[in-house]
Amino acid sequence: MVLLAFLCAAALAALARGTIPPPEEAARMARFVLHNCDWGALATLSAQEGLRGRPFANIFSISDGAPGPGGGSGVPYLYLTDMEISVQDLEVNSNASLTVSLAQTPYCKKHRYDPQNPLCAHIIFCGSIVKVNDSEAALAKKALFTRHPEMESWPKDHNWFYAKFNITNIWVLDYFGGLKIVTPEEYYNVKP
């Protein structure tokens, strides 16, 4: 627990110092933002009556690994139940987008950046949600429960499962002048 508190404090200190990657390092910025965010807005195509085929966004807790500098796999893991409306959408069509933003961290508040200001970096991932296999479940569990310890006590009868966001496209908005495109290969090959 002391180690977790230290890692969280180190991550917050790095954000507070403003040690984010420079705008010309878009792949590194994408990894940095994802790793420093605890939640994101997941958008699906609704399968619900009256909303069928329309975009539907919902907030989900995420983690790519334990908090702290240099950590994280870059893979956004989620803890899901099919009782959740967005998960029901994903059972019909697993395609989704995930948006994460430094607006949820102290960084943008410290610099007085509005969440829509490009300097308050945000990343948009497109891809699909897939259940993790048994060999990856332990990694997903550790990544999620380290950041979100409350999850471990959620009702067992909800049939929770571990999933990951399988990234196919990445857009970075971290500076004025428009979006930057990062390939999944660039994203996973860069050191965060």
UniProtKB/Swiss-Prot annotation:
Q: Where in the cell is it found?
A: Secreted
- Record's signal peptide: 1-18
Would you list which residues are glycosylated?
N95, N133, N166
Note the Pfam families from the entry: CREG_beta-barrel (PF13883)
Gene3D superfamilies in the record: Electron Transport, Fmn-binding Protein, Chain A
Looking at the record's lineage, which domain of life comes first? Eukaryota
An example GO CC term for this entry is: extracellular space
- Major localization class: secreted
Key words, A-Z: Glycoprotein, Growth regulation, Secreted, Signal
* PANTHER family, alphabetized: CREG1 PROTEIN, PROTEIN CREG1
Entry function: May contribute to the transcriptional control of cell growth and differentiation.
Q: Which family does it belong to?
A: Belongs to the CREG family.
Q: Please identify the protein, giving its name as recorded.
A: Protein CREG1
Q: What is the protein's species of origin?
A: Gallus gallus
Taxonomy of origin reads: Eukaryota, Metazoa, Chordata, Craniata, Vertebrata
